[in-house]
Amino acid sequence: MNEIHVKDGEGEGEGYRYSLSRSDKLFILAEALNSQTLPESEPYAGERQGASGEAYGETAGTYAFIVNHRGPSDREIKEEELFGVVNEGLETLKELGILPDSVREADRSAYDAVLYSAIDVLEPRNNVAVWKGSLSNIQKNNDRGNRLIDAYIDADDGKLYEFYVRTERTWADMDPDEIAGKWSGYLGLEAPQPYEGNNPLMEMTPYFKKYVFPGTGKGNTTATVGYYDGIQELFVKISR
């Protein structure tokens, strides 16, 4: 009871998952992440907001974010391929001006990777396979400057849906509107719209700006471009 199972019928030629638009994938992932009590990686979430005292992985509502124990399908990115794909994504984000050139490549040996499924519980065929890459605990006391700290990566095509990166840039060096626009183009989404009612207490930092990305079926997704000043960390996130 109270467990969610993901069946993959691709081996039988029927294709269990629906073909989802990018905006629907983004919406399902955001809702699933928001069903968690602590959507960020535990070692680094503490630096951002302090311990919550709650267990990671609890779910609520009609979406869930669970470990995908079956592993990637034949058409999904394998763990041994993941950080090559991640580094291609980082390079693209640099070319777009979202990240500075000083951000280092993600060395596979320095990161942990877990495959998850973001699921619409009421219609489980609507599910999104994502890798979560996080700088390893072993690296916690090492130099984290100019490094990718956390990311959620589409297991189908390697697009970075959410990421936290330590950078030499300050918030004053950044244009959140430009970052949001280029990130939406990178994902193939419609241009972001202003988020109405920005409240300075919505984040654990005063340096952020929120946007709404129109959906094609499921609904709109709110994304945040922000910056943690004390640890010099840029983030683009779709979770609360």
For each predicted feature, which ranges?
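Long, terminal "pre-/pro-" and other extracytoplasmic accessory regions
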Residues: 1-240
